[in-house]
Design a protein with these regions (language model features):
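Soluble catalytic domains of membrane acyltransferases
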Residues: 1-168
């Protein structure tokens, strides 16, 4: 399942209200799962308006509060750590293991682009799960686009896009 992120509420809604949540494992940014990495991630992800009057205070407090609270919560949910370095192979290997067990993945594909924003362009690295699943399991994965509408409190799942091994990514 490939939902829009919808800020922090998108992942929360998918975990709390998605009807298939019991069989799903969310890809989770490892930068938010490890307490020592959270402060740097929070600062780069712009949790507050850059240049605001309170920025020095926020910079000195929010990242450390987040580091104490968020990692234990994320580690308690069924998830797959997503690495943004050469450890990314661990993300894909764990994902394939879960798919072999009949589990579903929730992959938030949007590229963050600043305070409360996501770029119109999607990340593309996650697509490699398609060829990997084909090579290891001979399964053509189905990618379900999911729209999370916070205003209407609705999660809409669209028709799947099926991976085609003969079509280049």
């Amino acid at each position: 399942f490939c939902p829009n992120h919808a800020g922090a509420m998108g992942p929360i809604r998918m975990c709390a209200h998605f009807e298939l949540t019991d069989s799903c494992y969310s890809w989770m940014n490892n930068g938010m799962m490890e307490a020592k990495e959270v402060p740097a991630y929070v600062r780069q992800d712009y949790w507050w308006e850059p240049g605001c009057k309170m920025e020095p205070f926020y910079n000195a407090t929010i990242p450390y509060i987040a580091a104490a609270i968020i990692p234990p919560i994320l580690r308690s949910a069924p998830g797959v750590p997503v690495y943004h370095d050469n450890r990314v192979i661990k993300t894909f290997r764990r994902s394939i293991e879960l798919l072999k067990e009949g589990k579903n993945l929730i992959i938030f594909t949007e590229q963050p682009s600043g305070h409360g924003e996501s770029a119109a362009e999607l990340n593309k690295g996650w697509l490699q799960i398609g060829p990997m699943a084909w090579r290891t399991m001979k399964v053509a994965l189905k990618f379900y686009p999911v729209h999370i509408d916070l205003e209407k409190r609705r999660i809409t799942v669209a028709k799947p896009v099926v991976y085609q091994p003969d079509v280049p990514l």
